[in-house]
């Protein structure tokens, strides 16, 4: 069960994951131990999965983003497909989807040659019968945080 204080803590941490318990405590007018305990519980519940740095992929040299639609031969291969996707460093996201495909991957690579090499590898994964790629030309919104205002009506994430 999340209360308003938990939601405020999560909002602060989503804006800046390096915010200290002391800084959060000051902004919410609570004690440092109270904030630390709440963060610990949010982590134990799995609401906070991890803390990480958000990189600028273009400045890091990954200039090309693509969405790769996967058509799989049979659902027997899904587990191995997901395992391969999880092991592939170029795969940023992997989702099971409805429609003509079975999965969609969001991938980031250096250039078109790297994408071609990656697609060759993916097409050789067990069960993959076809891929279709769509290149991202421009990105106007990429969000890593959840809009916690929607939680004002639903406080239970269990």
Give residue ranges: language-model regions:
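A compositional/biophysical signature of low hydrophobicity enriched in polar/charged and small residues
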Residues: 1-158
């Amino acid at each position: 069960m999340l209360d308003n204080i938990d939601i405020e803590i999560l909002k602060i941490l989503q804006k800046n994951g390096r915010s200290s318990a002391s800084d959060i405590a000051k902004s919410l007018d609570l004690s440092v131990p109270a904030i630390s305990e709440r963060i610990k519980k949010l982590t134990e519940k799995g609401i906070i999965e991890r803390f990480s740095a958000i990189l600028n992929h273009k400045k890091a040299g990954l200039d090309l983003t693509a969405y790769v639609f996967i058509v799989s031969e049979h659902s027997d291969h899904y587990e191995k497909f997901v395992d391969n996707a999880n092991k592939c460093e170029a795969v940023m996201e992997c989702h099971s989807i409805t429609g003509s495909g079975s999965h969609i991957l969001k991938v980031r690579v250096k250039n078109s040659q790297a994408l071609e090499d990656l697609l060759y590898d993916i097409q050789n994964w067990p069960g993959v019968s076809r891929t279709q790629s769509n290149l991202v030309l421009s990105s106007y919104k990429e969000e890593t945080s959840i809009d916690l205002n929607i939680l004002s009506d639903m406080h239970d994430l269990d």
